[in-house]
Design a protein with these regions (language model features):
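S-adenosyl-L-methionine
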Residues: 1
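Amphipathic alpha-helical repeat scaffolds
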Residues: 9-13
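Mobile active-site "lid"/loop adjacent to the S-adenosyl-L-methionine
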Residues: 14-52
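Conserved acidic residues
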Residues: 5
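Sequence-level detector for compositionally biased, low-complexity segments
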Residues: 21, 28, 46, 62-566
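Conserved phosphate-coordination/catalytic loops
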Residues: 50-58, 117
Length: 566
C-alpha cells in the first residue's frame, strides 16, 4: 500500500474586482502565475488569456503541481466556464496531458449573458450565482504518460435547484452505474464540447492582425473592438448636456485629486466616490501627475446597443480602450460603414449588425468586433495641417481614406465572379452571408470560438444574390428610423397624448403570458396589431422591438447615480 494524496475544495470563482473603485486588486503570485504562463497560457490559441489567471484556474494549477509524479486525486466544484471557452483551450489540453482520468459533472446554471429560452434551458443554479457550475474529479496515476480518458455527464435541461440536488444525491459517487458517462474525444484545438468544423478552417478568415500583408484575409488588419469606456454610467447618456456636465465634473474632480496628491494633502484617492470611475488607466495617469483638460474633450453619437444610440464622452484619458476606432471614425464627419460581429465565447447565438457610427464594445455579446469598409490613414496629418491653417477647414482633410476590404479577396472574387466586382459588392456579400441561416447553423460552434470565415459561393449569380441581399439588409438596419411604418399597426390614445415613457410593457393574454402584438407605451398610448413575425429578426439575443423597449426607458445608474432618460 502507498499513500494517496487527495486535494478537494471549492475555489473562489472570481477573477477579482469589478472596477478600480472596489479597491480589491487581484493577488499576484509570481511562481504560480509563471507556471500558468508556461502551461495553460502557452498552449492556448486565444489572444486574451486573462481568464487563465482566475482564482479557480490557479487552484487547479497549484493542486496539480502538489500531486507531482506520485499522482493522486483532485476534486473541485468550480465555475464551469473552462469547459468550452476558447481562452481555456490550453487549460483543457494540459489537463488531458497531466492526468489519467477526468470526470466532469456539468451542473449547468450558466445564465449570465444568456437571454430567453437559452437562459431557461440552463435551469436554476445550485448556488445563488449566475455562473455555471461543474464538479471535476481528476485522477493521476504514478508515472502515467498516456492522455487522459475524459468522462462527461450533463445534468440536463430546465431543471430546478431541488431537482438538481436530488439527482446529485441519487448518484452519490462517480462510480454509480446510474451515471451515463459520455467519453469525450477532444480535437487538435482543445475542444471538448461543441467541436468546431474542419470545413470552416478552409475558408478565408475575416482578419488576422499578424498577417500584415493580407495574404489570405477578407479585411485588412484595421478591424477593431468596440469602444470600451469602463465607466458607462458616467460616459453615456441620451442627453448631450448631461454627458458634457458629467465630463466636466469628472475632469475637475480628477484634477483636484491630482493637485491634492501633488501637494501632499491627499495620500490616496477616494475609491468610494461617485464623482469619477477609477479605472486602471486613470489611476496610472494620476500617479504620473497627468493633467486632464475639458477643452480637449469630444462628444460623439454611438451605437450603444442594437438600435439604440447614445451620446458619449469621446476623450481618450476617460475611455479605457478605443482600440482601432480612431482609424475607422477619426472625426465626427467621418463617412464609413462597419460590419460588427459577436466576440468569442458569448452567451447568445452569433449575431452581426452594420453601423455607420462608433459602436460600444458590448453592443454585441462577448465584445463586438468591427470590420470596416474603409479606414483612415493619418500618417501625413502633420504635413496636411501645415497647408490647412485656415478657419473652418474640413477635419477630414487631415486623413487619407484607405480600403478595408483586402486586395487579396478582391482579386479572388474578380477571378471567380468577373471583373466588375467591387469592394463594396464584397462588403455587402459578407453581410449577406453572415445573415444566412444555413451558415449560422452549420458553423454555430465555430462562430463561438473563432472569428468568422467567408465561404465563396460557386457562381456569379449566387454571389450577386448574397451581395444584393446584404445591401438591402444594410439599408434597413442603418436607416431603421426613416423606413415606412408598417401599415397594419394601430396606435390608440386616451386623454391628452403624452409621449413620456418610464418603461414599455407587453400586453397580457393571461396572468403569465405576454401578448406581443400589443405594447403599452405608457398609460395614455397603446400600440396594437404588431405582427408576431416582427420578433423573428433577433440581434444579440433579442428582437429589434425588444431592444427598443429595454433601452428606451428611464434608468438611474447605480454606480454613478446619474439619470438617463431617453
Amino acid at each position: 500500500q502507498a499513500p494517496l494524496r487527495v486535494i478537494m475544495g471549492n475555489p473562489p470563482y472570481s477573477i477579482g474586482q469589478k472596477s478600480a473603485n472596489d479597491n480589491a486588486q487581484n493577488q499576484y503570485y509570481p511562481l504560480l502565475d509563471g507556471r500558468i504562463s508556461d502551461t495553460y497560457a502557452k498552449y492556448t490559441d486565444a489572444n486574451n488569456k486573462n481568464s487563465l489567471h482566475d482564482s479557480y484556474i490557479k487552484a487547479f494549477r497549484w493542486s496539480t503541481d502538489r500531486l507531482g509524479k506520485e499522482g493522486g486525486v483532485i476534486g473541485f466544484i468550480t465555475n464551469s466556464g473552462w469547459l468550452d471557452t476558447n481562452a481555456c483551450s490550453g487549460f483543457r489540453k494540459c489537463l488531458e496531458q497531466e492526468f489519467s482520468s477526468i470526470y466532469v459533472f456539468n451542473l449547468r446554471g450558466a445564465v449570465r449573458g444568456k437571454k430567453g429560452e437559452l437562459a431557461k434551458k440552463e435551469g436554476k443554479n445550485v448556488f445563488d450565482i449566475m455562473t455555471g457550475v461543474s464538479i471535476t474529479i481528476l485522477v493521476k496515476k504514478p508515472c502515467d504518460k498516456t492522455k487522459a480518458t475524459i468522462y462527461y455527464h450533463d445534468i440536463g435541461n430546465y431543471l430546478s435547484r431541488e431537482e438538481k440536488f436530488r439527482i446529485i444525491k441519487s448518484f452519490g459517487s462517480i462510480a454509480s452505474p446510474a451515471i451515463n458517462w459520455k467519453v469525450l474525444t477532444p480535437n487538435e484545438h482543445g475542444d471538448w464540447l461543441n467541436l468546431r468544423s474542419e470545413l470552416f478552417t478552409t475558408y478565408p478568415v475575416f482578419g488576422d492582425k499578424e498577417d500584415k500583408k493580407n495574404k489570405q484575409t477578407v479585411f485588412v488588419p484595421y478591424y477593431s473592438n468596440g469602444l470600451k469606456t469602463q465607466r458607462d454610467g458616467w460616459a453615456y447618456n441620451a442627453s448631450l448636456k448631461i454627458v458634457k456636465d458629467t465630463a466636466k465634473s469628472q475632469i475637475d474632480y480628477y484634477n483636484q485629486q491630482r493637485e491634492g496628491i501633488k501637494r501632499g494633502e491627499i495620500e490616496e484617492v477616494d475609491y468610494s466616490t461617485k464623482a469619477i470611475s477609477w479605472t486602471t488607466a486613470v489611476l496610472a495617469d494620476i500617479s504620473r501627475g497627468k493633467e486632464y483638460r475639458f477643452a480637449d474633450t469630444e462628444f460623439r453619437t454611438v451605437c450603444y446597443r442594437p438600435f439604440c444610440k447614445q451620446n458619449v464622452l469621446y476623450y481618450k484619458p476617460l475611455n479605457e480602450r478605443t482600440y482601432q476606432m480612431p482609424k475607422l471614425f477619426p472625426a465626427k464627419e467621418s463617412q464609413n460603414k462597419i460590419i460588427c460581429v459577436s466576440g468569442l465565447g458569448g452567451g447568445v447565438p452569433f449575431s452581426c449588425l452594420i453601423s455607420d457610427i462608433i459602436v460600444d464594445l458590448n453592443c454585441l455579446s462577448a465584445g463586438a468586433q468591427c470590420f470596416p469598409l474603409y479606414w483612415y490613414d493619418d500618417s501625413t496629418a502633420d504635413i496636411a495641417d501645415l497647408f490647412n491653417q485656415v478657419p473652418n477647414i474640413n477635419p477630414m482633410d487631415r486623413y487619407i481614406r484607405r480600403d478595408g476590404v483586402s486586395d487579396w479577396i478582391l482579386r479572388e472574387c474578380k477571378q471567380r465572379y468577373g471583373n466588375k466586382v467591387t469592394r463594396e459588392d464584397i462588403f455587402y456579400y459578407v453581410y449577406g452571408i453572415l445573415h444566412s441561416p444555413e451558415y449560422r447553423t452549420t458553423f454555430e460552434a465555430d462562430l463561438k470560438k473563432m472569428l468568422p470565415r467567408l465561404p465563396l459561393v460557386d457562381t456569379p449569380e449566387q454571389f450577386m444574390a448574397f451581395s444584393q441581399g446584404g445591401r438591402k439588409l444594410a439599408d434597413l438596419h442603418l436607416n431603421y428610423e426613416t423606413v415606412e411604418p408598417y401599415a397594419g399597426v394601430t396606435i390608440k390614445t386616451s386623454g391628452t397624448p403624452n409621449y413620456e415613457v418610464q418603461k414599455m410593457r407587453f400586453g397580457k393574454l393571461d396572468s403569465k403570458t405576454a401578448d406581443k402584438t400589443k405594447i403599452i407605451y405608457n398609460p395614455h398610448i397603446t400600440i396594437e396589431n404588431i405582427p408576431v413575425e416582427a420578433y423573428e429578426y433577433v440581434v444579440n439575443g433579442k428582437s429589434a422591438i425588444e431592444w427598443a423597449m429595454e433601452r428606451y426607458q428611464v434608468t438611474v445608474d447605480k454606480a454613478s447615480g446619474i439619470k438617463n432618460d431617453p
